[in-house]
Design a protein with these regions (language model features):
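N-terminal helix-turn-helix DNA-binding core of bacterial DNA-binding proteins
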Residues: 2, 10-52, 66-67, 74-92
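Short, hydrophobic-biased segments on the C-terminal half of alpha helices
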Residues: 60-61
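C-terminal structural segments of small proteins and small subunits
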Residues: 83, 87-111
Length: 114
């Protein structure tokens, strides 16, 4: 395997857990809330949520396992915060795939217009 393909393969392997974690609507909503509201306690994250506090805790743990979020103690509360590095890696992966598709579509257009 060429070094370029090997690097691409490593990037995909690293981002699969991120995309899997973001593939759930509840977790995606939690990411949006944390990205717009900053660090939040579980109590605050469950306000106006259609799921229980226990469910939110489980979803946050999935995000943490994927490297997307982490918690810290603030007194008696756990405060959750996003880790933007993994989101950036996922975005770069999508940008790379988009560039590949743009290139393929450009080549197809040239071929068809001959």
């Amino acid at each position: 395997m060429s070094p370029k393909l090997l690097n691409r393969s490593r990037i995909l392997e690293q981002t699969v857990p991120v995309f899997a974690a973001l593939g759930d609507e509840t977790r995606l909503r939690l990411v949006v809330r944390l990205s717009t509201g900053g660090p939040m306690s579980i109590a605050r994250l469950t306000q106006d949520a259609s799921v229980t506090r226990q469910a939110v805790t489980k979803h946050l743990q999935v995000l943490a396992d994927a490297g997307l979020a982490h918690s810290s103690r603030l007194g008696r509360e756990s405060v959750w915060e996003l880790d933007l590095e993994k989101l950036g890696a996922a975005r770069r992966c999508i940008d790379g795939l988009s560039a590949q598709w743009d290139g393929a579509l450009g080549r197809l257009k040239k071929f068809v217009e001959r």
